[in-house]
C-alpha cells in the first residue's frame, strides 16, 4: 500500500524531520509525539530516535557532503532532500547498518511517497554513489572557522564566537564534546539513601553535585525510587543552583523564571516554615511546577503565580523576599548536546536582545529584595554576553548591590567568583551561576 512507508522506522523518522526542518518543530517534541502513537517495536523506536537526533545534530556536515553530489538542491522537493539527509546520516555514522538496507529502504520510501518516478531514481543514484566511494573529508577545508563548522555541524558565527571567547584549543574541546552521548542524571532527595539507590540503579555519584547520580544509559523515571519521590530528574549543573542560596528554612524565596520546577522544588526541600513563590508566563508550565511539588511532597512549600518576571516590582512590594533565584531566559547554547536544534535557531543578534531581557528581570526583582538578601543568577548558556557581562552591567547601574564570590570543590569551574561550566569539562550541560547581595 502507498502509505506503508509511514509505518517503517525510517518513514517515521522522515515525517519527524520534515516537521523539524520544514515547519520549525522542536525535534524532541515532534519525536515524542510520533513515538507515542507508533506501533513500532522498541528496537525500531530506538532507530527512529537515533536517526532523528543524529540527522539534526549533524545537519551542516550532511548538507556539505550532499552538496558534492547534488548539483541544484533547490530543484528537489523538501521531503526528498530530508530523505537523503537521514539516509546519509546512517551511511556515514551508523556502521552497524548495512549500506544496502539504507539504500533499499530510502528507494522504497521515495517510490511510495513520490508522485513522480524521478524521485525514486534520484534517491537511488545519489545514495548508491555515496555508499560506493569514500565520503568527502571536511578536515581538508582550509579556512579554520568553515572547517570546524562543517566538522562539528555548527554555524560559522557560533564557531567564531566560541573561539573568540575561549581560544581555539578549548573551543575545539567544546565542539568535540557535543557529540558525546548525554548522560542520564537525577537528584537524590534523601541523601542518606544515596549509596543504596546508586547500587540499585547502576548509577555513579556525580563529580559535580553531592546529591547527584548519573549513568550513561537507562531510565531513572521508571524506577520505584522515582515514583516514591526519592529521585527527581535534574541535570548535574542545575543541581548546583539551590545550594548557593544557603537556605536556612524560614525564608520567603522568589523563583522568578521557575518552569518546569526542578530548582523550585530543590529550594523548597530546604524549607521549614518558609515558601517559594514560583512564577511563569504560562498556565501549563505552572501546572508542571505544581505536579513536581506534589510528587515530592512539597506542595505546601510552593506557591505559583502567572507573571512576567520583568513585572515583579509592579506586583510585589519592596522587602517581599529574603532570597531570589533568576534562572534567566537565555540562548540555551549550553544545551546543544541534548537539544541540537538550538544551534540552528539562534543568531549573533540574539545575545544583545537576551541580555536586555535578563537585565530587565534583574532590575525588576531586585526592588522586592530585603536588605542583606541575595539573588542567584543562573543560565544554561556559555556565552559571556548573557553571563559575566549581565552581572557587570547590573552592578554598574545598581550601586546598592555587590557580587558574592561563590565556591565549589571543582576549582576548574570557578571564574571570578562565578561557576562557569562548559560542556567538555564534565560532559554536562554548559551552565553559569553568579550571586549578588543587596547591601545592608
Which ranges hold each PLM region?
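S-adenosylmethionine
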Residues: 1-440
